[in-house]
Amino acid sequence: MSFDVTVTLQIGERRICAEIRSDEKLTALVGPSGAGKTSVLDAIAGLRRPESGRIAVAGETLFDITENIDLAPNRRRAGYVFQDARLFPHKRVDANLSYGKRQADSGASCIPREEIIDLLAIGNLLRRWPTTLSGGETRRVAIARALLSGPRFLLLDEPFSSLDVERAETLSLLIERIRDEFAIPILLVSHTAAEVDRLARKTVRLDGG
């Protein structure tokens, strides 16, 4: 199963219960703002500890409260593309990509760097500073860095946020190719209904509380 997640999270006074069970290559997690979608992604990546539950991705148990399993974030091998991208502003694009490569586990099956650069059409951006990139370019670089880390799975948090129609279309085409060409489960959070309908083979709704 791509994603087998049943967790309870305590965020301040709010209690979030999430269940994601999907065999699909790309699963969408949707819901209103404040429902806790990003918190669920954080829990899957190992950045937030659930109060209870179990997290398994691609057949590997990452967290199980009853079995006392809680893998460290680096052992979970999540390719996490945050909503704000989080590129290193003091490193050129090429160095940001190299950082992703250094994070790859020695035993991980990695997609060749040049293949990723060609796929995401960022060869002309390698000498640029992150602050000079457009929103669409920034997202493409962030996805490339995540893929270079040899991820077990990808977490994409609002990748279409603030993109115009043309850049959103370009990014959609790239995510489609990643979904179809690579054996990497993808969990996508998006408020863009058209993109969810286009990309996701299964949609899970999180209402929060």
Summary of predicted features, one role per range:
Residues 60-65, 108-125, 176-177:
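Conserved ABC ATPase "signature" region
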Residues 62-79, 103:
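ABC ATPase NBD coupling module
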Residues 129-133, 137:
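Conserved ABC ATPase signature
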Residues 148-152:
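A short, proline-enriched helix->beta-strand linker immediately N-terminal to the Walker B motif
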Residues 154-158:
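Catalytic Walker B motif of ABC-type/P-loop ATPase nucleotide-binding domains
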Residues 165-167:
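Helix N-cap at the start of a conserved alpha-helix in ABC-type nucleotide-binding domains
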Residues 183-189:
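Conserved H-loop
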